[in-house]
């Protein structure tokens, strides 16, 4: 058997044990054989694989120098300071019209077809901040753009709920 390493275009890594396959790249060290397809091999240069312990047991962690940086969490205080300074950033509200009608940040653009086209045309290193109610949906949108190669992505930690509680108490919470 061989260990098959796959690294997809989003730099998600997977390991599987199975029979050796023809083609691709093969690396052996003693009794262990690692196989990669040609696309994974191109993404694996410099890859470090480590065994880690967690509450769920042992697993693997991957440190890939070619992977785009993770989505950064931006606090509401950091966003306010950036807006006050006039920093060049793009702020998008990924919630639907119904939620934006309840509470909104004036500086945020709604996440619609026009916003998607705008972001798709921005440089990969543009500062882009996504927000939603509490941060879950905006994190998912940011991760989508991370997989597309964008490198300066931020999720507003706590979303508009945190903004309303910590920055502007006149914005309603829901």
Label the predicted regions.
Residues 25-52:
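N-terminal accessory interaction module
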Residues 1-2, 28, 95-96:
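Non-catalytic interaction surface on structured domains
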Residues 24-25, 119:
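Short, surface-exposed secondary-structure edge patches
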Residues 1-24, 32-34:
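Short, structured protein-protein interaction patches enriched in aromatics and acidic/basic residues
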Residues 8-10, 134-137:
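Gly/Ser/Thr-rich loops at beta-strand to alpha-helix junctions
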Residues 8, 94-95:
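Short, well-ordered beta-to-alpha junction loops that form the rim of enzyme active sites
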Residues 38-46, 55-90, 96-129, 136-174:
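Rhodanese-like catalytic fold shared by cysteine-dependent sulfurtransferases
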Residues 30, 92, 134:
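Single, functionally critical "micro-switch" positions that shape active/binding sites
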């Amino acid at each position: 058997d061989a260990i098959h390493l796959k690294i997809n275009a989003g730099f998600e890594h997977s390991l599987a044990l199975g029979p050796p396959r023809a083609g691709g790249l093969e690396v052996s060290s003693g009794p262990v054989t690692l196989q990669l397809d040609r696309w994974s091999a191109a993404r694996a240069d410099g890859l470090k694989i480590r065994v880690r312990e967690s509450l769920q047991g042992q697993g693997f962690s991957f440190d890939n120098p070619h992977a785009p940086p993770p989505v950064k969490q931006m606090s509401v205080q950091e966003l306010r300071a950036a807006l006050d300074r006039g920093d060049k950033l793009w702020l998008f509200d990924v919630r639907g019209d119904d939620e934006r009608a309840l509470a909104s940040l004036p500086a945020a653009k709604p996440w619609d077809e026009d916003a998607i086209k705008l972001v798709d045309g921005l440089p990969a290193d543009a500062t882009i901040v996504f927000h939603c109610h509490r941060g879950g949906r905006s994190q998912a949108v940011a991760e989508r753009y991370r997989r597309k190669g964008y490198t300066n992505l931020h999720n507003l930690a706590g979303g508009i709920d945190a903004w309303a509680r910590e920055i502007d108490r006149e914005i309603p919470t829901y």
